[in-house]
């Protein structure tokens, strides 16, 4: 624990811990020239092309998602080949740096972050394809039996024998070593590309793409681990004893899939998810026709498509679904996009993904709200409580896992020769049980090189804060109140312009409040908490 805390302190000391905004290359040490008229014309053309590309990409995926068939992205991107050049990025940086209008500068910053992300992704696209192929063909062997590598989690969930679960986990090591070798090549390429674009490191670039800093990400991860610790110990201590017959500190990483399989509840949602969604929107006074909805997607999974928001936002729904959580998640994302006010396209489709994700999670969380489940899914009180408790346990575990992976990745940058050990320290702290050498072998395959976990944590915290505000203003059944819907539409109008931290302050907080997430989860974990500690 002290080792990780020291690393976080070193990160804070090395940077500007007081701010949460992105550190782009020239922000740290301005050496950029003044923009020319040619630069301004190039940026105007870039904005037009980027908007067209994003709309076309969404349309392409919508057609494939709802009609079936493959997506030929390579052919699609061929027509935009001239968009992704360092020369155009440099012109954009000069124009943004000289922009005196804060709103215009913010929009251009979002465009710059998107272009940087695309350039970095293109640098590693070939290696990423090799990784996918490697994982698709990999196998693990145990007692003469060979299994698809991708089936490891289901195998662990179905295996009743703890010793065999450990053997399955150990059998993954040769595959992990092969994956690590390709990952090392990918990291080297990414590091070189990020430095060529002016960033101090690939992780600095990853943080900037989340409109954040490494130091801020490290502090967030540490706060999540600290704030959720007591609740995690209570809940997962109880879960481990009841489902595995062991204390939390005595289980292994290989036992976790089995544990979560035991958390699954037999009661399923009714078939009519669309009816529940429409009823919820009616209660909020939100027009359902703001989003184009098509049911019966061949993929069997829901997905929102912001083709040209706010006018053209679409939602593909499966014909039937055993779990409504993904449906309401995508519905929340679609509603957010469909209510953005006219303005720079960057605020509607670019910007901080965690802001949009927070509203998606807010609606997803309805399917883990016992009162909403009784009202819209027809569950009994016991069934609703069981569903809510299982969902809260998964969210709590996932939050600590994200935080641990972030701490491990940030610490590794400070001492790469200690990567496996640092991963072990971070994840043992997050999980609450020891890791074996086989578990530490996951330190590369499990690494969060792009710091995606930071966005997930920010979204979950902000969603909990939004829910607390809705409950405080409109009662426990806030989804029945048109005034609650009007308030949400006001927030949606900004699109992704505001960061999660800014939006948290707008709704009355001093910033992102991890305790809001803790309170939300404690309130729903009742079935797994001692009676005197249940919220």
Segments from the language model and where they lie:
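Bacterial signal peptide processing site
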Residues: 17-20
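N-terminal helix-rich structural modules
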Residues: 24-178, 184-185, 451, 535
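C-terminal, non-catalytic "cap/extension" segments appended to globular domains
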Residues: 28-35, 39, 61, 65-69, ...
């Amino acid at each position: 624990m002290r080792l990780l805390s020291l690393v976080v302190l070193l990160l804070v000391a090395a940077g500007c811990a007081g701010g949460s905004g992105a550190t782009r290359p020239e922000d740290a040490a301005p050496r950029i020239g003044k923009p020319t008229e040619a630069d301004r014309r190039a940026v105007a053309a870039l904005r037009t092309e980027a908007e067209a590309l994003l709309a076309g990409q969404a349309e392409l995926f919508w057609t494939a998602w709802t009609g079936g068939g493959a997506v030929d992205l390579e052919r699609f991107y061929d027509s935009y080949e001239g968009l992704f050049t360092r020369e155009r990025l440099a012109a954009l940086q000069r124009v943004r740096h000289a922009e005196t209008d804060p709103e215009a500068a913010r929009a251009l910053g979002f465009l710059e972050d998107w272009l940087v992300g695309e350039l970095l992704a293109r640098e590693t696209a070939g290696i990423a394809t090799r990784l996918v192929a490697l994982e698709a063909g990999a196998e693990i062997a145990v007692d003469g039996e060979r299994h698809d590598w991708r089936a490891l989690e289901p195998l662990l969930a179905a295996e009743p024998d703890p010793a065999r679960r450990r053997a399955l986990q150990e059998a993954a090591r040769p595959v992990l070593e092969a994956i690590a070798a390709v990952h090392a090549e990918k990291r080297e390429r990414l590091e070189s590309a990020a430095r060529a674009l002016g960033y101090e490191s690939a992780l600095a670039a990853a943080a900037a793409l989340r409109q954040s800093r490494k130091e801020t990400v490290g502090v967030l991860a540490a706060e999540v681990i600290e704030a959720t610790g007591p609740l995690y110990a209570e809940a997962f201590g109880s879960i481990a004893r009841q489902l595995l017959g062991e204390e939390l500190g005595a289980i292994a990483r290989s036992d976790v899939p089995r544990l979560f399989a035991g958390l699954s509840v037999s009661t399923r949602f009714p078939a009519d998810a669309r009816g529940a969604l429409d009823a919820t929107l009616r209660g909020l006074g939100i027009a359902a026709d703001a989003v184009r909805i098509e049911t019966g997607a061949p993929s069997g999974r829901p997905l929102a498509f912001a083709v040209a928001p706010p006018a053209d936002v679409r939602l593909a729904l499966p014909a039937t679904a055993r779990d409504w959580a993904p449906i309401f998640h995508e519905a929340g994302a679609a509603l957010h996009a469909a209510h953005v006010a006219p303005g720079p396209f960057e605020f509607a489709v670019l910007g901080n993904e965690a802001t949009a994700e927070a509203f998606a999670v807010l609606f997803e969380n309805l399917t883990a709200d016992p009162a909403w489940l009784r009202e819209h899914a027809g569950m009994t009180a016991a069934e609703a409580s069981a569903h809510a408790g299982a969902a809260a346990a998964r969210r709590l575990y996932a939050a600590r896992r994200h935080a641990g992976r972030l701490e491990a990745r940030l610490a590794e940058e400070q001492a790469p020769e200690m990567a496996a050990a640092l991963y072990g320290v971070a994840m043992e702290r997050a999980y609450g049980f020891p890791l074996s050498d086989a578990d530490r072998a996951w330190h590369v395959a499990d690494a969060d090189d792009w710091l995606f976990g930071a966005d997930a944590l920010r979204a979950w915290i902000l969603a909990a804060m939004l829910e607390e505000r809705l409950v405080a203003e409109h009662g426990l059944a806030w989804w029945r109140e048109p005034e609650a819907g009007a308030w949400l539409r006001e927030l949606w109008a900004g699109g992704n312009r505001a960061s999660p931290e800014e939006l948290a302050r707008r709704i009355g907080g001093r910033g992102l409040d991890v305790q809001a997430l803790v309170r939300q989860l404690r309130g729903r974990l009742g079935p797994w908490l001692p009676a005197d500690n249940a919220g």
